[in-house]
């Protein structure tokens, strides 16, 4: 029992406890009213730090996903433009295939060329005008564009879209023809000699080198279509190399395709002025295509060029095609797939004099000047092995070792859609390959855009989950558990009620001293 009246210890202790309970109850009340466990740094300093960092990451993830949505929108616009370009290229390819048909006359091919040029202009406009928020997407300027997707520094994805301008679409072309007028003239002039300028011997090879450093080499043993012995030397068709290249899966993977053509012009004039075939004399002319005899005929009288052309076409059956050049003075010989054109002229002179004064078979190459060959009682042979055209999507270097093709390392020259010309059969054939390469480029760009969209969408989905989990982690630290906090509040409330009652009792204790004063 208290016997002092100047200091009521029990009341003081009860009051202190009451104030503590009041403070705790008020804080619990604020937590219940705000839903926050941490109302200030004093409540949980380390918890506040962690919660604020988590909130920062969550905000960054939210904005990063918004950035991803912007990027996906831009890429979808780009993909739509590229899809339109593909449709135009497909139509261009159809027209190039149509132009390659020799049934078309020059006017029809010119009309097809105009259609192709209009399609090319449409591609140009799409490539120049496709944009997102003023940013050009398909003209090559959309390069190394960074999309910041994450909540942290350097969490970016670099996006590039290659140019689809017509001057950027196409392929690399390397063209070579090993025959020259001089070589052919030598064959005709030096009758009976062996010409090895167009041959492949054992150990010879043809090599391709690409810009990424990879290389492919074909040696003469089987890979070029022939078996060679140690001493043998054989004529090699352009068509044989074409078949080898086009059937090689590695080259196909590099986008390499070969095409061969063989068009030879000869200054052949058959009239009474230049060719005098006396009675009893014979001139036998034989043509081979790829080693196969396709035409042979013996003439004992004057023959015109028109008749000679008709004789060849009637007998060769499409394996060798004869026509006249625009001047009407040259014989033009062509093979469908670049096979070797071989010619033999055999003169049987009945009286021993020179009867052939001007059959210029020496100018088998287009545009080359012929020479007069005086032949008596002998056989002359000339060979043109075809023009080899190699085309690819990426730049490459091709070199032949021991064969006439590409004796010096030759890099492909880029030919774009602007170079497409289908006014000739050769141009239409090359145009098909160039457009195929353009389609390959466009499809590559489309797949890259699609892959990037999928990548961004995957990042978006992952970050959406990460944001949810981050928000939950922050909530656990920062927000109040109402069930637990209500229990605490009830406890403090009861303590306050009992504290007030006990403080009243403690304040009454000093009154007991009055009993001693009675």
UniProtKB/Swiss-Prot annotation:
UniProt entry tagged with the keyword Secreted: yes
Q: Is Lipoprotein one of the keywords UniProt gives this record?
A: no
Name the UniProt key words of this record, in alphabetical order.
Bacterial flagellum, Secreted
Q: Which GO terms describe its molecular function?
A: structural molecule activity
Subcellular location, principal: secreted
Q: What family is reported? A: Belongs to the bacterial flagellin family.
Gene name per UniProt: flaA
GO CC term, one of those recorded: extracellular region
The subcellular location is: Secreted; Bacterial flagellum
Q: What is this protein called?
A: Flagellin
